[in-house]
């Protein structure tokens, strides 16, 4: 009964595991990732800030009441004055205009930054997903190796009982089997750890069971890649390029806004207020409309305004230099990524040949070992070479896909 209960629980655990393809994992990450949610909030905040800056150019209305309470010994009544006022900026030297333009570009920059983080998130998910698959396939190789050694250990144990071989042959295979068991345990632990990393990226609970589906690699030919064309396109239209341009534009608007401090500020105020102070001891219903113009000009402030303006103009130059440096780095990264992709493709072809050779060698050596032509040392060496060739081939296939995704991410 206990065995059936354990089997039922095990089946439930499997049935409640979340199966994910790579595309599903990417979509889930975009939906749940906490860092991406924070960035989305930043975009909304910048939009609200843009609205606030635009509204600074609109008139504002305020109600104002002034109350004065005098000392009774002076025989003066307490008084108050009421008014409703409408204020409208007329001229601010371009401060309101450039702040509004700057806030718009800041919002667009934040949107581009959201896209950048989305691209980075997708690449992180792919890298983590690929690592899990590499470990999963590596585990299959080691489990096949363990089964091979278990089968061989049984044969050699029978041979030893028949006094056909000495005990050292059995011990070598047994030792190798223990080492394989240890490797399997390490790989399983690594898979668990890597899945924890992936679940964190996807915004899943760490106790959530996930099962990653194998990937069908689409055939893509690196010969179809036009490196020069891709690089030129990335320099002009990539998200990074757009962000760099916006940084310069923001600096220019900030500089023009600082320059407005040298110009006068003119505001129009239109009010409806009581003619004079009204007393609590008498009734006064006389109100009138009043209009006024406020003119303000900071003539001298020991050059602090000029220093701020010069600082802002230097910021423009700094951002232009930063753009040149960043785009040069981007070109170098695209070139390097392309070369990695070419190398990875050739590596796959080489590893395929190496795997075929290792497999054929192992089959020959296995036959020799069965016929006692070679000893367990040579057999285990051949088996180890086959295992390493299988793992290397697995990794090269997945690395090729990963390099291709890294190349594409640099162009976006």
What function would you assign to each model-found segment?
Residues 153-170, 361-380:
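Alpha-helical hairpins and coiled-coil heptad-repeat segments
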Residues 16-62, 166, 206-249, 299, ...:
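Bacterial Sec-pathway N-terminal export signals of envelope proteins
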Residues 79-81, 127, 172, 288-290:
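Transmembrane beta-barrel architecture of outer-membrane proteins
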Residues 37, 60-77, 87-116, 242, ...:
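Small/polar (Gly/Ser/Thr/Ala-rich) solvent-exposed segments
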Residues 17, 118-233, 337-340, 344, ...:
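Periplasmic alpha-helical coiled-coil/stalk elements that build and connect Gram-negative outer-membrane
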Residues 4-13:
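Sec-dependent N-terminal signal peptides
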Residues 83-85, 129, 290-294, 338:
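Membrane-embedded beta-strand positions in outer-membrane beta-barrel channels/transporters
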